[in-house]
């Protein structure tokens, strides 16, 4: 009789434990949290339903089901390298979260791994980003495009690495976001992107009279004019050419008198070469 009472008491305790929380969504969330987000909500619901929605029994069933021979990849969260980390973000504003992670295991990650949203607030429509397979002890940065909620407040979400077969592994990455009117995170990241874009543009030559505020056509015209100028100064005819023109007077005569005065004035004729710079310097 006493044995029957003990069995009855255990059965009643089982029922009372199941009736402690009637909201199945709460049980699924608690089950997932206790497992460190190693299982998706559908998997949590499967084990809970199998154990009559008893949280403790479901956790035991999960660990009994897991095979100890599975070699789970390893991942450690290194640091948050988000541009403007710690600043609040305005409502309904796009931003980028970047985390530095490391493969702390002894084997390379399998192909097809990803960083996946697992719980809390999901910022935007992106719930997964592919991550390349890291070698042992290799470090890499992973970025996720997000959008802040439309209502100011404090928000949080969780992300985890996941294999192609759905096995979660590594540290849980938390997103804790402060949404405030007048937040600077969006502006900070925009300025950083503009600076990066400016630094990656081809460098312009600053030689000559380059004006950074002038139009490209103006600078191009000035450059072409500079090419036409003699770097030694104003253009002058070569001295040999001048002397050649002057020496050409040896073979001709110059009549510098009107027709009416030809009888009284003689015609000047140069019979010797002129070496000086002035053609009439010698008589």
From Swiss-Prot:
* Keywords for this protein: Cytoplasm, Immunity, Innate immunity, Nucleus
Stretches of Polar residues bias are at 241-254
Q: Which GO terms describe its molecular function?
A: ubiquitin binding
Methyltransferase among keywords: no
Region annotation (Disordered) ranges: 198-254
Tree of life domain: Eukaryota
Pfam short name (any one): N_BRCA1_IG
Looking at the keywords, is Nucleus present? yes
List cellular component terms (GO).
nucleus; phagophore assembly site
InterPro entries per UniProt: C6orf106_UBA-like (IPR039517), Ig-like_fold (IPR013783), N_BRCA1_central (IPR032350), UBA-like_sf (IPR009060)
Q: Where in the cell is it found?
A: Cytoplasm; Nucleus
User: GO:BP terms for this protein?
Assistant: innate immune response; macroautophagy
Among Gene3D superfamilies, the record links this protein to:
DNA helicase RuvA subunit, C-terminal domain, Immunoglobulins
Composition bias type Basic and acidic residues, residue spans: 219-230
* Biological role stated in the UniProt entry: May have a roles as negative regulator of innate antiviral response.
- PANTHER family on file: OVARIAN CARCINOMA ANTIGEN CA125-RELATED, PROTEIN ILRUN
For this entry, the protein name equals Protein ILRUN
Highest classification ranks of the organism: Eukaryota, Metazoa, Chordata, Craniata, Vertebrata
- Designated gene of the protein: ilrun
